A protein has these predicted regions:
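Conserved N-terminal entry element of GNAT/NAT acetyltransferase domains
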Residues: 1-15, 154
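Conserved acetyl-CoA pyrophosphate-binding loop and the N-cap/start of the following alpha-helix
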Residues: 93, 97-105
Length: 154
């Protein structure tokens, strides 16, 4: 198997990232996302680093995984949580260490930043495979449930 590399996403990745967002939303939540909206939203992150950053995992020059990191300020900790979001691993690359490499990269970068106090993510309550993966990587369920009012997707 070819070597896996992790890099920051750039403007040339927008279409691929957005396409993978749509595939992930359809697979995990049965939601068909609007292509133009996902392209605009993805481009917004690439153009404005204060929103977050994408990491891309490549093998043999092909994108096999990706995730988004966004930021949440914690006044309790006087620090920033990095949130892992929009995780996608190509179906043929699953169970080959792609997510682990992305995760380890995020945690390593987060630990190197003085103002980062932790890494969080949310996972669908029925996605037991992902929950096992996250637990195996040292993550544990938090004390919180997520509540929302979604003005776009309902």
């Amino acid at each position: 198997m070819e070597q896996l590399s992790i890099r920051l996403a750039h403007a040339g990745d927008v279409d691929t990232l957005a396409r993978n967002h749509r595939a992930m939303a359809l697979e995990t939540e049965g939601k068909a996302l609007d292509p133009e909206t996902t392209i605009r939203g993805t481009r917004a992150v690439i153009e404005d680093p204060s929103k977050g950053f994408y990491l891309v995992a490549e093998r043999g020059g092909e994108t096999v995984g990706q995730l988004l990191v966004t930021f949440e300020w914690s006044d309790w900790r006087d620090g920033t949580f990095w949130w892992i979001q929009s995780v996608h691993v190509a179906e043929e690359a699953r169970r080959t260490g792609v997510y682990r490499a992305l995760h380890d990269h995020v945690v390593g970068k987060a630990r190197a930043e003085k103002d980062v106090c932790g890494v969080r993510l949310y996972v669908d309550k029925e996605n037991h495979r992902a929950q096992k993966t996250y637990a195996a990587l040292g993550m544990r369920p938090a004390h919180y449930d997520v509540f929302e009012i979604d003005f776009v997707l309902g």
